[in-house]
Amino acid sequence: MARAAKSAVVLCMDVGLAMSHSNQGKESPFEQAKKVMMLFLQRQVFAESKDEIAVVLYGTDTTDNALAREDQYENISVHRHLMLPDFDLLEQIENVVEPGSVQADFLDALIVSMDLLQKETLGKKYTRLHIAVFSDLSSPFSVDQLEVIIANLKKAEITLQFFLPFSVDEEEFGGSSNNRGNAGSSDRGCGPGKGLSDQQKEGIEMVRKIMFSLDGEEGLSEVFTFRDSLERLSIFKKIERRPMPWPCQLTVGSSLSIRIVGYKSVTEEKVKKTWTHIDAKTHKKEDIKKETVYCLNNDEETEVEKDDTIQGFRYGSDIVPFSKVDQEQMKYKSEGKCFAVLGFTKSSMVLSNQFVGNQVIRMFAPSDDEAASVALSALIHALDEMDMVAIVRYVYDRRSNPQVGVAFPHIKDKYECLVYVQLPFMEDIRQYLFSSLKNNKKFTPTESQNSAIDSLIDSMSLIYDDGETKEDLFKTSKLPNPQFQRLFQCLQHKALNPESPLPPIDQHLLDMLETPVEVKEACMAPLATVKACFPLQEATKRKEVKTADEIFTKKTDEPDAKKLKEDDEGFSLLRLADGNVTSVGSVNPDQDFQALLRQKNTDFKHVSDQLIKRIYECLDVKQTQYYMKSILCIKTFREEAIKLSQVRLFNDFLQLLKQKVDGSALMEFWDIIVQEEISLITSSESKGSSVTPEEAKQFLAQKEEKVEEAAMMEDEGDVDDLLDMM
């Protein structure tokens, strides 16, 4: 396996006297340069980059470099040699690096950086050697070795970048507002006076000459201002992942096999760093010891060894023991990797709401297999021309469970592949029944209301299209995960400032999550129209449902004593029993259900769930007397649901009950339901129902035709029908 590509980078920072000067109310170039370096290093640390970083400071009060001889290369210090960046380096840049009181030649510092790169990368493999210079160009320099420096940079293939407090663009420097490349935003006036000093102007010419010599006309694209760099580096870099190939054989039937290689295209990114417990005082993980003890559930809490325990599976109220041997025998035994085509279907048969899983895989032909490339290309183009997709069986390896998925043809100018997405099994699909809005005239929108919503949707389009060009106003693929950004921000802050509270969320991150300005402006008028078409009204509190006893109670202005006496006389045993009922029992569940509903502040759904539980318990006995008891409960449930406008709960229950008894030993019970004509609550019985009387009759009718059709579908085994059933 090829090693991960890595670079060697030297950060060469000017810490001379002039770098600490600033205009009133503005940050000095030194502080700006430190911020840029900190952001760059933070990105490298959290991205777990393999790039090695060195730091060279020039303008220091001391000299510490390998080239220092007498009066040469003075006031230049190698602060850190090439190694992976870490929090120690961040802390040093933040707290240790301070401005010096002298100036140093930045070309000498460039030579020291080149020497460090060449010596410390000798015998190692790096994909890139790079030097980044942070300066305000106020330091004097000698041009004696300029041509030698440029020649050595080219020979060693060292790339160069400059980070400055101002632009070096010639037009902008001359006063034009033209912004070219990345050096277009100007942050002038960083020195003690307005504008640039003569030394800085000479430095700009020197930078331009070096960059043009290295990269030609594109050289200035590698010169950045501090302000521009802060904006670009404010987002933490994502963790770099190497593409891991998944070699397999694409099989169609038993005679056609094509070599393929799969790569993950989309998958959920998770934070690799995990939380661990450390001692609050010493901050060391080793000072914490964790022990797990297994005890019996008895008074003595007898301790047992882990080897003397096995797992158990809760099955109702019982626990079924399941040993490791049982688990191994139960596991699905796969033959290994698999990407087998089960069949083909029209792409319109596969709906996007059926996609499941947490990844998208792209299947390519191996680059060194011409026969596989030709065969796979023919399959991809055939699927594309016929508007078809492949339904496939996917197994990652012999330890994995099989998946069923869909493979789409994907053709681009530079490549073509199959895109695999997982599809659900029967148990993965949730079927819900909701009342139709069309059957209730109260909820039918007018033409003006429909038009207002259409206009709002059109105005909130995230695609800008003027007829000639299309632009995505909200590029989600370029949007960083705010969870990661916030986590990295807090970790970095705590690492450098352990005692201070966490900082607020960066404003630039909040701005990224906001609706684009263009969309906000475009939807103002349609929003006003929607508000006018859908006026809000204060919802009145529903009246409490009163019992007949409460409705017909005498309401007179008699003395309290007399009223109390009459209340005592009228206190019935029925109401006393109601007060004692706390749940639906198994003796008289229908009466308990009604008694609970007569109590105030009763949750209908909670009580009905108890009744449904008792109904299923009676059905489990599978005896006629218990069937009749269930019928009585269902009738009571239906009556109370109509009274209290809880139609949906009853209809959902009856539909689920029908599914449960269909094809089982409970068909005798369902025949009783049909004879008693206990069907869904219709719209003629309650306004809250969307079920018509015809639909209620059809609900109780036998469905022989559908059974025959289902049998035919099973015999044919067509993939199109398979997707319809899903």
UniProtKB/Swiss-Prot annotation:
Keyword flag Nucleus: yes
Pfam family, one: Ku_C
Span of domain VWFA: 8-160
Domain (Ku): residue spans on this chain: 253-449
Modifications made to the protein after synthesis: Ubiquitinated via 'Lys-48'-linked polyubiquitination at DNA double strand break sites (DSBs), leading to its release from DSBs and subsequent proteasomal degradation. Polyubiquitination is not required for completion of NHEJ.
Intrachain disulfide bonds: none
CDD domains recorded: KU80, vWA_ku
Predominant localisation class: nucleus
Outcome of swapping S229A: Allows binding to nhej1 KBMX motif-containing peptide
GO BP terms, alphabetized: DNA recombination; double-strand break repair via nonhomologous end joining; telomere maintenance
Entry note about domains: The VWFA domain interacts with the KBM (Ku-binding motif) found in a number of DNA repair proteins.
Quaternary structure (record): Heterodimer composed of xrcc5/Ku80 and xrcc6/Ku70.
Protein name stated in the entry: X-ray repair cross-complementing protein 5
Organism encoding this protein: Xenopus laevis (African clawed frog)
UniProt lineage: Eukaryota, Metazoa, Chordata, Craniata, Vertebrata
Gene name for this UniProt entry: xrcc5.L
